[in-house]
């Protein structure tokens, strides 16, 4: 089976029992809650990617970042003959609450943005049915049971309906 590699940088912002998530619009995690973040642009450092992606997907500016760590997951969509090895660098972030929130790009269809906006998800409401593997990995970490070994999803179901917010 072919294995494709994907590397991304993602923000973990956890406040008052809620995790900052985005509503994904495309890809294997579409219509699920995902972490703000994504791929590096040419010549971009990790923290530059982090702050740019958070701004693009949530409209927030990052005030500080800390606790860098790396995890990986393997995702094979159902009925696909390839698997994605998704390597993720995570940073804990604090948002700049005094800065005005920037308007999120509405150019989702042109590929500039794959987020419909942000939502604060109660950690107890995050499930495999409504969240990406990245969010699920962070949930275990936040609950005090971090899974350091690879996690595999061998029959990942892509959602074709939007998630329901509580």
Residue ranges and their predicted role:
Residues 68-74:
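Generic short beta-strand segments
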Residues 29-31, 36, 63, 69, ...:
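A generic structural signal for short beta-strands and their flanking turns/coil linkers
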Residues 1-19, 41, 65, 88-92:
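Conserved N-terminal beta-strand and adjoining loop/helix that marks the start
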Residues 108-166:
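Nudix hydrolase/Nudix homology domain
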Residues 18-56:
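Conserved Nudix-box catalytic region and its N-terminal flanking loop in Nudix hydrolases
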Residues 40-63, 74-131:
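Unchanged
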């Amino acid at each position: 089976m072919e294995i494709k590699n994907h590397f991304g940088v993602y923000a973990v912002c956890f406040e008052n029992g809620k995790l900052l998530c985005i509503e994904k619009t495309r890809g294997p995690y579409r219509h699920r809650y995902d972490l703000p973040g994504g791929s590096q642009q040419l010549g971009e450092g990790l923290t530059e990617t982090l702050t740019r992606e958070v701004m693009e997907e949530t409209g927030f500016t990052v005030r500080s970042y800390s606790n860098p760590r790396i995890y990986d997951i393997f995702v094979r969509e159902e009925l696909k003959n390839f698997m994605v090895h998704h390597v993720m660098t995570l940073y804990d972030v604090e948002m700049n609450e005094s800065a005005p929130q920037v308007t999120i790009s509405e150019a989702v269809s042109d590929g500039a943005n794959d987020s419909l906006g942000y939502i604060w998800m109660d950690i107890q409401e995050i499930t495999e049915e409504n969240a990406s593997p990245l969010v699920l990995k962070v949930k275990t970490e936040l609950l005090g049971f971090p899974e350091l070994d690879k996690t595999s999803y061998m029959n990942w179901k892509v959602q074709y309906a939007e998630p329901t917010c509580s």
